[in-house]
Amino acid sequence: MAIKSFQGKRIVKKRSSSNRLLVSDIMSYKLVLFTPDESIHDVMKKFIKFRVSGGPVVNSYGKLVGIISEADCMKEISDSRYFNMPILDKTVKHFMTNNVQTIDVSTSVFDAASLFFKTKKRRFPVINKDKLVGQISRKDIVIAALNMKSQTWR
């Protein structure tokens, strides 16, 4: 009888769902928030000051009501020049995106990456029980992928 292997029986650990890398593990918790009544001029100042290209818009109760981005501001700048109107008196509520797509904190990083790929969006607000708790960006996903070990690619 020949020896087939010098190794013993291979034991493969079954991965539990708790080992999955989740959005909550890599998202940003410190956010630059905007309000619907904030002026576009103030928003652009915040973009420069905090080096962000957009962020969530919340009402006085802290509920997510929209997203404002540099692209929204570019539209206002373009329109103001075309109509020869100042941009100082316009507010976020006139230019923000109202129907906001969100990601739940319990979503896996891979599902989030797939959503980023399908939608071409740069960031998503992260929700836990209908409450805004953070934000995840494409950059967060890329950083997480670079830090993963081969065993976590599931």
Report the location of each language-model feature.
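Tandem CBS (Cystathionine beta-synthase) repeat/Bateman regulatory domains
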Residues: 1-154
